[in-house]
Amino acid sequence: MLNKRTTEVYALGQHISMSAHKARRVIDQIRGRSYEETLMILELMPYRACYPIFKLVYSAAANASSNMGSNEANLVISKAEVNKGTIMKRLKPRARGRSFAIQKPTCHITIVMKDISLDEYIDTDSIAWSQNKKKDTTMSYYDMYSNGGTWDKK
């Protein structure tokens, strides 16, 4: 049987005060890149969104080394997404006792990092078979035809 191993860690930043559109501009540049390359790109880009994203990438790498014992050289950003958050509404006083509404947008940023050195699946049958070599393993399914390859599905 194949058991799924967790090879991904994430860091989530909520209610970051910037528009989701401006944060997506930076996130699109780092998606799918390695950890070291991402840090280098974020340090050199001139956008205000780089600093909170840098902190999230650094936090996700710290989660990977703490929870899974991963090396930072093996980490790759597998998923990075920006969602629109709540809009803070403020009033700006204007002339003649009037006021204008100001909308301050927020966003939620999720960074998911994957360790490429770990296998995603663990074959528990091979581990059990190596411990008990007398175990008979047959690879036949109850709903297969006798000729082999056709499944009995409509």
UniProtKB/Swiss-Prot annotation:
Keyword Transcription regulation: no
Location relative to the cell: Plastid, Chloroplast
Family annotation (InterPro entries): Ribosomal_uL22 (IPR001063), Ribosomal_uL22_bac/chlpt-type (IPR005727), Ribosomal_uL22_bac/org-type (IPR047867), Ribosomal_uL22_CS (IPR018260), Ribosomal_uL22_sf (IPR036394)
GO MF annotations in UniProt: rRNA binding; structural constituent of ribosome
UniProt keyword annotation of RNA-binding present: yes
Cellular component per GO, a single term: chloroplast
UniProt function note: This protein binds specifically to 23S rRNA. The globular domain of the protein is located near the polypeptide exit tunnel on the outside of the subunit, while an extended beta-hairpin is found that lines the wall of the exit tunnel in the center of the 70S ribosome.
Assembly and oligomerization: Part of the 50S ribosomal subunit.
Family listed: Belongs to the universal ribosomal protein uL22 family.
Identification of the protein by name: Large ribosomal subunit protein uL22c
